[in-house]
């Protein structure tokens, strides 16, 4: 392992011990805010500190085994122990490097997931419905909660656009790589000649941001329109102008919300989504500037980001960012997404490790 990485690990291990001592101090316990902040820091440092301690122990085992090689009677056993210890050290070094990667503070947050039908008319709206169902099933498997914020249904089913808030542990960290263009190739139910059609949808995933961190929005920059809800919603639909459309004039970002019967609730939801969208756009712009020399696996939610192709006749899904093809389309559409998410998370970590190595 590089000396610069060992030095970083030593500093983090020392800080872990320092924080542990501070947490036992009466003055810290009396100051609840400081105690909470230090408790969080202690939890964040615990894994790396424990792994580093184990790695140091393995280094000692390697030294002991190397010394034993000089003894003819112990040589065979020493060679075996040395081989095992080196393999353990290598495994731990990989773990430590991943633990050293910069954490995205948004990863643990809830997320807004937007699915929009693109080219392909009714078929694109149906596919948007299929994608939303896929994400909902995945959320269910992880015990996350799905709340529809706004839905604009397609004429023959599916959605022209649907926005949902998904709440639970680590939602954004798992779903953030879904942002971008998703393409479907299949024979529509209305196609009499059996021809395969290609349609597209875009997905945008944004972390839900606490109110204190939302960008300041000048009320003068907003145009707020009210209109009557359309689509599913029972007897209360079309009786009042409860639906809200907010346009942020400087950026042109538009958010609609018509899920609630109350105009006030729809407005609050729309403003929450708008704030997250503006922040996401600012972050994407910054990332684009930073990643101009390096590929960026995190999509912007723009249709030009071609993430995946879902080919129904062949039963396959291809992730174009990492050249991965899986022939388990039915499972994936039922929400078994880990086989697609895990490889891209690993690839992203490998890119981060390469960036870390460049810095050193």
UniProtKB/Swiss-Prot annotation:
Function summary: Peptide chain release factor 1 directs the termination of translation in response to the peptide chain termination codons UAG and UAA.
Residues annotated with N5-methylglutamine modification: 235
HAMAP family documented for this protein: Rel_fac_1 (MF_00093)
Protein name as it appears in the record: Peptide chain release factor 1
An MF annotation (GO) of this entry: translation release factor activity, codon specific
GO CC list: cytoplasm
UniProt keyword annotation of Protein biosynthesis present: yes
PANTHER family according to UniProt: LD18447P (PTHR43804:SF7)
